[in-house]
């Protein structure tokens, strides 16, 4: 029942984080200032590296913001044939052939089958002419008539100078997102709000734009309204499939944030300064990942990366194993930075058997060898220092257990610092080891998130009881916090646990967050 609402391994489980080498002298011991943005645990001490760090609303805005950095990235100027070569090169087509598992796409499902109907969430993408572009389950050809009906609904409402946003019927939501020249439709039987589902459709839209650029997309449909966009996107469906999977499982996409590899502050500083020293004229962003966790990010001064763009980059890297085979070079549009042109990303792993992946983002399509040289200079500098071995040791235990917090009733939590756009959470405990249980817990977090960000009646605090767990959500100007407790706990105990948790995060913030990001 609902309560009150107000306006890697076993070895890791008992491990502790590395001893504090040095805490920031100007950081308050008490987490109380976290009620104000910029003073919360995990707040950056210098300018943040994410633009719009709090922008959940940014995902559901009516119109796109005009990029302040417009002109930094050149318009690619590719013809349609050239673009097809870009989208179809090795980083897309061959990766698709070797990386997509039978479980990742259910293209053989018939829409009249029970299996197809049993999916709790469907996503469809079509053109304004009603041409099918993508479906999560089943084949686009078999669903072409269904998508035609969807487009007819959109057109009928628009003919009356109105916009269809959603349809609610019999426990099912149908959400529409019109982003000319595309229309995206989500059909859901989950407890997610319209706004949550709209956020997911926005991510899918940005994923498509990242492959083509909005300029090219508009150009194609201006010349031929009934163009079949699947010709250009062939082989890239696995990226959208994987992104949808991440939307169901990754708290970062829910929180509009990124999580960091827990790492001693002194080690992270050495890694960051080594990356900063390996700069080049056209280099805009240097990103070092450890799986789905951020080790460090160095950016060009006055150029900011949006967390959505970083999520798209992480999705590209995480969707393919072929980047481990050598140095990759791929065009990618970062739609929250500039929808008009491509960046070019040098993607490689520091070691073939390591999870450390380096992404160097350049504005020059001919910059492969310069970026390769940057990587070598970074490696040469880093391998001369003991920090590299410490970094590799940290990979053996890339998370931490909730037991380290010292709150017996606490099972799991999500904490986001609003000013930094970073979040932290422990590994899932034994009770939530199965995929089904993790998705169920994420569904509960999504429900809490929906209440806190309700478009009409947003809440600051929400406490919910279920048969399996009790949950608490709290949002302030400085942070968002979601906690999962044993069902035997009480609301008073949960509120008391918040202060203990914030103190623990404050004590460990040097290794859980990047407090002082560097620039070139």
Swiss-Prot record:
PANTHER family in UniProt: SAND PROTEIN-RELATED, VACUOLAR FUSION PROTEIN MON1 HOMOLOG A
Record lineage: Eukaryota, Metazoa, Chordata, Craniata, Vertebrata
Top-level taxon of origin: Eukaryota
Biased amino acid composition, Acidic residues: 70-79
Region Disordered: start-end pairs: 1-43, 55-79, 93-114
Family the UniProt entry places it in: Belongs to the MON1/SAND family.
Designated name of the protein: Protein SAND
UniProt record, GO biological process: protein targeting to vacuole; vesicle-mediated transport
Matching InterPro entries: FUZ/MON1/HPS1_longin_1, FUZ/MON1/HPS1_longin_2, FUZ/MON1/HPS1_longin_3, Mon1
GO-annotated cellular components: Mon1-Ccz1 complex
Disulfide bridges in this chain: none
